[in-house]
Amino acid sequence: MAVIAIGLDVVEVARARGLLERHHDRILDRTLTPEERLYVDSLGDPAPAFAARLAAKEAVFKALQVFDGARTIGWRDIGVRRLGDGRPEAVLLGHAAAVVSRRDLTLHLSLSHSRDVAAAVAILEDAPRLGVS
């Protein structure tokens, strides 16, 4: 596989906390999928997880900019879910899924957060070509 795009984003947890304090329901409904909302709302302190999801969505959005039509991808067109082993996985929905349709791609996502910041890296790879190793 060959890397075709990388996206990176960092979000301050304090900024995410402020958004939650001022606009909790509105900001969560606008930015998160229903599955993400359930997860974030289940946490005692949702700000770090919310910040990580914002960073992830922005990192994936940046990686997808190599495709025509990607500029209009919305917050809820990119989801983040946790796999059984705890790793994050990006899920492309709606317009994001349409932008990459009929392409054989792998999207890797890594998230990290501390008390102060959340960061995400998205790496987009194309499928290996037949007969090429």
PLM-predicted stretches and their roles:
Residues 1-133:
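Core catalytic alpha/beta fold that binds nucleotide/phospho-ligands
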